[in-house]
Amino acid sequence: MHRGYDFFRPDYLCIGTEVNEIYRDGGPQKWNAYAALHQQTYQELKKEHPDLPIFASCTLPQAFQQRGGMLAAFQKLMPYNDLVAISYYPFFVPEKDRLAALDWLPAQFDSFQKPYAMVETNDLAERLPFPKSKHIVLDGTPAKQRAYYEKLLALAQEKRFVFVISFIHQDYDALWERIKDSAPELFIAWRDCGLLDERGRARPAYDVWKAALNLPLQE
C-alpha cells in the first residue's frame, strides 16, 4: 500500500471495493476479519498521510432496504472511512426502487457528516436479454438512463459529492464480441450502459452529464 501511494500520489485512496459484499457472501465471521484488517490499514496509513482521504466503498444491493445486517456492519466501519463511497447500478434494482435508492442513501449516512462519493455507476440504455440465461432480461431505455443521471447529479449537487465516476463512457459491443466466449455472462450487463452508444452517438443522458460538468465549481 505504501509503495502504491509513493508511485501514484493519489488525491483519494480506496483500500476496499464494494466490501459489504463480504458480509453478504461470507457472513459476520468473515466480515469481522475484514473489518479488523480495514481498521488497521486505515490507521497505519493515516499516521503517514493524515490529510489523504482514505475509504472503502459499498454497493447498494438489489434488496437494499432488506439488508439491515449488511448496512449495520458497514456503518460500524464508518469511523475508519473518510468518505461515504458508493457504487450503484440501478438496472439490477426493481423498477419501483431504482431511483428511491438515492433517497434512501442520505437517510442512512447523513448522520456521519462525511463527504459522499459515487465511485462507480451507470444505467442501462437498451433492453438486454441475457443470451444464455434466457429468463434474465434487463429492461433499459435511454429515457430511464437519463432520468437516473438527472436524479443522481441533482443529489450530487445538493450533497456536494466530492466526485461521481460514470463507469462506462461508450457501449462496448465490439469488445463483448471478442470476449463473450471466455468472459462470465454477467459482463454483458454493462455493455449498453454508455453515455454514447456503440457507434459513438450521444444518448440523452450525455447532455445531462455535460450540463453537470459545466456548472460553476464550488469550493
How would you describe each model-predicted region?
Residues 128-129, 134, 139, 144-148, ...:
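Aromatic-rich peripheral "rim/lid" segments of glycoside hydrolase catalytic domains that contact
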Residues 1-15, 33-44, 48, 69-77, ...:
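An active-site-proximal structural segment forming one wall of the substrate-binding cleft
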Residues 21-24, 59-70, 89-101, 126, ...:
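Acidic-and-aromatic substrate-binding clefts and catalytic sites of carbohydrate-active enzymes
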Residues 4-8, 17, 23, 45, ...:
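Sec/Tat-exported extracytoplasmic proteins
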Residues 1-31, 55-57, 162-171:
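Active-site groove signature of glycoside hydrolases
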Residues 49-54, 73-133, 150, 154-157, ...:
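Glycoside hydrolase catalytic-domain groove-lining segments
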Residues 19-32, 87-96, 136-143, 193-200:
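The substrate-binding groove and active-site-proximal loops of carbohydrate-active enzymes
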Residues 37, 44-48, 52-63, 80:
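Active-site cradle of extracellular carbohydrate-active enzymes
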